[in-house]
């Protein structure tokens, strides 16, 4: 089973110190005017000014390893990627959006700019799914997830964009904005490698992740995120 094999490889690679350590923060996505971000959230809610400011505050708070940020931000819709990139740029960042319509030349230029340390180079690339696998950007030192977790495979692939070792970073920061998503239970499955879907083990991992994860990596969930994941575990068939 490919899903199981992929997760076992991640766990073993971490144990053998083959990957860059990561610090994962599962934090609550914003509630806007009593609307909780979920799988069916309206586009306008996802690009609300207050949410953008909240996201920027959090990615600044949690930071990165190195002299400057080299970040990837995964979102759920192409329109969202383009709009959020515009809004970040209005707030002083240098970002771009890459979707499936981008040419190979555009992708390569964006990746080269994200890797660069020169003035004017990209701080972030917003994308939906084209960076899930097969992309090598070793300097990535921050990954933000602004989308539902639809499978443990995709979660690990997106996390993996920051796990290449590089002498300009000691670790990668992963910030997962957790809404009230139906499939939040995939988060502990992906991070723990627990493929038998034992609900008690998944709950324990969410509560005690730092005690279980191999190597120097750490995992933290805030209390509301824990409750949302526990709820998804309880409702999962």
Can you say where each PLM-predicted feature lies in the sequence?
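Signature of the SF2 helicase/ATPase Hel1-core->accessory helical subdomain module
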Residues: 1-21, 137-157, 161-170
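Long, largely alpha-helical accessory region at the distal end of helicase-like NTP-driven motors
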Residues: 61, 65-66, 70, 77, ...
